């Protein structure tokens, strides 16, 4: 059974997460405020960041960078900027 939340990223009611996807206080906030659709958008950006910046999830500094980018993207409205990347035109 799905739950509906007000997604602070999309600024509308949307389907919420089925369970907490990320640990700690940030994870609780994501569970309560970020929809599945918004989370999917973040996962796409996260994958680009990991690949383009050659981040290693074994490296604590890389994980901290990724977490900060996630908070900026989901809660502060800042887009992820990757040097040399130009989004495809619609």
From Swiss-Prot:
UniProt-recorded name of the protein: Probable Fe(2+)-trafficking protein
A Pfam family that the UniProt record links to this protein: Iron_traffic
HAMAP family recorded: Fe_traffic_YggX (MF_00686)
GO cellular component terms, semicolon-separated: cytosol
PANTHER family assigned: FE(2+)-TRAFFICKING PROTEIN-RELATED
UniProt similarity note: Belongs to the Fe(2+)-trafficking protein family.
This protein's UniProt keywords: Iron
TM region positions: none
GO biological process: cellular response to oxidative stress
Quaternary data: Monomer.
Keyword Iron: yes
UniProt organism field: Yersinia pestis (strain Pestoides F)
């Amino acid at each position: 059974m799905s739950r509906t939340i007000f997604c602070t990223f999309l600024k509308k009611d949307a389907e919420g997460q089925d369970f907490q996807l990320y640990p700690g206080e940030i994870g609780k906030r994501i569970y309560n405020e970020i929809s599945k659709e918004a989370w999917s958008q973040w996962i796409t950006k996260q994958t680009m960041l990991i690949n383009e910046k050659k981040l290693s999830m074994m490296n604590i500094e890389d994980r901290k960078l990724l977490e900060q980018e996630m908070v900026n993207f989901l809660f502060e409205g800042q887009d992820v900027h990757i040097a040399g990347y130009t989004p495809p035109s619609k």
